[in-house]
Amino acid sequence: MPTVGIKKVILDKHFKRVYSEKEFDELCFEYGLELDEITSEKAAVEKEQGTRAASDLNDQEVYKIDIPANRYDLLSVEGLARAIRIFKQEIPSPAYKYADVPKTGLQKIIVKKETAQVRPFVVGAVLRDISFDADSYASFIDLQDKLHQNICRKRTLVAIGTHDLDTIQGPFEYRAEAPKDIKFKPLNQTKEYTAEELMTLYSTDSHLKAYLPIIQNHPVYPVIYDKNGVVCSMPPIINGEHSKITLNTKNVFIEATATDKQKAFVVLDTIVTLFSQYCAKPFTIEQVEVVYEETGVKELYPLLSYREMTVTTPEINTKIGINLKDEEMATLLNKMSLKAEVAAKETLKIVVPPTRHDILHACDIAEDVGVAFGYNNLITKLPESNTVAVAFPINKLCDNLRIEIAAAGWTEALNFALCSRDDISSKLRQPDALSHAVHIGNPKTLEFQVARTSLLPGLLKTLSSNRDMPLPLKLFELQDVIVKDSNTDVGARNERRLAAVYYNRAAGFEIIQGFLDRIMRMLNVNPARDGTGYYIEADENSTYFPGRCAKIIGPKGVVLGHIGALHPEVITSFGLTLPCGAVEINVEPFL
């Protein structure tokens, strides 16, 4: 969930009144938002970078507001204040419209076929006669950053470029060229660089280096030229210095290149609808014509589509648990920046503006009705039918086991279900384990790459983090592991396991075996080799020390797991220095 930080004085300016902290907190709650924190620029920088870095900043209050991830129209103070003022019925919903076609015609972007290799789509728009001040200019830049981090998925799906139209001339060309053939002066630089040189230059830039891999391995890079061959931008990396916008910019040319065309529509609509309020003719946007040279297809942007939806009031009432009349529900929806009217008895026709791309289904309409009605006004009542909850047998069994194990002097550990690839393979001396593991498609950290196939890595990490505690350390965990299974509909299944480790100056095999005996006694399983009880049998497992490992065989000859002294390489790979005994069994056969 993105967080927007806005100075209180700017909020007051846009709301045209002063809210107290309590009033604004309640107002946010009414609209389905949350005032996360009240801080200041100085306090925020002091917290992250220290007192010296914050010495030149001011102490003006900054309200940090949590915004739903799909409400891109609330990512700037312009959209937030407008939406809440409409909600408070202080202003009507604006009507977004296209500007008249200039005498010189619409601006054009001609798309060359080579762009299909790297970023095939582009959209554009023009904001004419716009007036920026310091606050609105900063908000304009900040909105682009917020969009890049959210819907644009860090510029992989969409990259936004904004330019001073008075410094460049159309028609524009969107090309894809070899890096050595692209040369221009990038934003905030004093000399020209080739695209190859820029990749080296920005490889150490804390902000831009994250975007380099998006195009770095492509044979061609995307680039936008104006009529005179001036480079406007090299998306998704950097804009050109020549066309950068300033406080004095009067006409803004907006382009957005994309790998996802739908996301580009949404991004462009969001920017122009929020900032067209600063144009001489508010909420008026000039279109840009995009021409695909290879196919001859011509498209006009932005779309500014007003979509129509039809819902029935009984359906919405049932979802929320209220009983509103048609007219009452229409009034509530109008407060949420929608245009609703009664089309027929128990039927509403709703017009969704281009700011509300989050409205996709009748459920979204129901959510807006709930917000406008007020969640605090919903009456809680008991359902007409009773359903009595019953614990799953496996959970009931595990809860009983936990109580008994803790009573025996063992401490329970709770570890993450995800771990690194090394944790379940090389560190456990199990090179084949990765073929049985469920892998995360796009892991954010090295610690969360696969779903665990064993409980031992988590317990050994816990030991490593607590090795300064008094010995012995006796830990257990009773949780799920995830293993591949082609017989299930998703190709994997959960398996409930119990694992324990004993860490001391001696491996304490007798301690860990005593733990196993106690567990079996609690499960009413006696030592026996006739298929009715359990027994251990010497076995080889590379995780354990040779000659000090056994497999545990349960009723009906089912192999439950292994017990033994861990191999020294396993112990040292987790940062431990003393011997360690371990046991891990599957508890599901005991159901």
UniProtKB/Swiss-Prot annotation:
<feature type="domain" description="B5">
    <location>
        <begin position="304"/>
        <end position="380"/>
    </location>
</feature>
<feature type="binding site">
    <location>
        <position position="368"/>
    </location>
    <ligand>
        <name>Mg(2+)</name>
    </ligand>
</feature>
<keyword id="KW-0436">Ligase</keyword>
<dbReference type="GO" id="GO:0004826">
    <property type="term" value="F:phenylalanine-tRNA ligase activity"/>
</dbReference>
<dbReference type="InterPro" id="IPR005146">
    <property type="entry name" value="B3/B4_tRNA-bd"/>
</dbReference>
<dbReference type="Pfam" id="PF03483">
    <property type="entry name" value="B3_4"/>
</dbReference>
<keyword id="KW-0030">Aminoacyl-tRNA synthetase</keyword>
<keyword id="KW-0547">Nucleotide-binding</keyword>
<dbReference type="InterPro" id="IPR040659">
    <property type="entry name" value="PhetRS_B1"/>
</dbReference>
<feature type="binding site">
    <location>
        <position position="358"/>
    </location>
    <ligand>
        <name>Mg(2+)</name>
    </ligand>
</feature>
<feature type="binding site">
    <location>
        <position position="367"/>
    </location>
    <ligand>
        <name>Mg(2+)</name>
    </ligand>
</feature>
<dbReference type="Pfam" id="PF17759">
    <property type="entry name" value="tRNA_synthFbeta"/>
</dbReference>
<dbReference type="GO" id="GO:0006432">
    <property type="term" value="P:phenylalanyl-tRNA aminoacylation"/>
</dbReference>
<dbReference type="InterPro" id="IPR020825">
    <property type="entry name" value="Phe-tRNA_synthase-like_B3/B4"/>
</dbReference>
<comment type="similarity">
    <text>Belongs to the phenylalanyl-tRNA synthetase beta subunit family. Type 2 subfamily.</text>
</comment>
<keyword id="KW-0479">Metal-binding</keyword>
<dbReference type="GO" id="GO:0005524">
    <property type="term" value="F:ATP binding"/>
</dbReference>
<keyword id="KW-0648">Protein biosynthesis</keyword>
<dbReference type="GO" id="GO:0000287">
    <property type="term" value="F:magnesium ion binding"/>
</dbReference>
<dbReference type="InterPro" id="IPR045864">
    <property type="entry name" value="aa-tRNA-synth_II/BPL/LPL"/>
</dbReference>
<dbReference type="Pfam" id="PF03484">
    <property type="entry name" value="B5"/>
</dbReference>
<dbReference type="GO" id="GO:0003723">
    <property type="term" value="F:RNA binding"/>
</dbReference>
<dbReference type="InterPro" id="IPR041616">
    <property type="entry name" value="PheRS_beta_core"/>
</dbReference>
<dbReference type="InterPro" id="IPR005147">
    <property type="entry name" value="tRNA_synthase_B5-dom"/>
</dbReference>
<keyword id="KW-0963">Cytoplasm</keyword>
<keyword id="KW-0460">Magnesium</keyword>
<keyword id="KW-0067">ATP-binding</keyword>
<dbReference type="InterPro" id="IPR045060">
    <property type="entry name" value="Phe-tRNA-ligase_IIc_bsu"/>
</dbReference>
<dbReference type="InterPro" id="IPR009061">
    <property type="entry name" value="DNA-bd_dom_put_sf"/>
</dbReference>
<protein>
    <recommendedName>
        <fullName>Phenylalanine--tRNA ligase beta subunit</fullName>
        <ecNumber>6.1.1.20</ecNumber>
    </recommendedName>
</protein>
<dbReference type="Pfam" id="PF18262">
    <property type="entry name" value="PhetRS_B1"/>
</dbReference>
<dbReference type="GO" id="GO:0009328">
    <property type="term" value="C:phenylalanine-tRNA ligase complex"/>
</dbReference>
<dbReference type="InterPro" id="IPR004531">
    <property type="entry name" value="Phe-tRNA-synth_IIc_bsu_arc_euk"/>
</dbReference>
<feature type="binding site">
    <location>
        <position position="364"/>
    </location>
    <ligand>
        <name>Mg(2+)</name>
    </ligand>
</feature>
<comment type="subunit">
    <text>Tetramer of two alpha and two beta subunits.</text>
</comment>
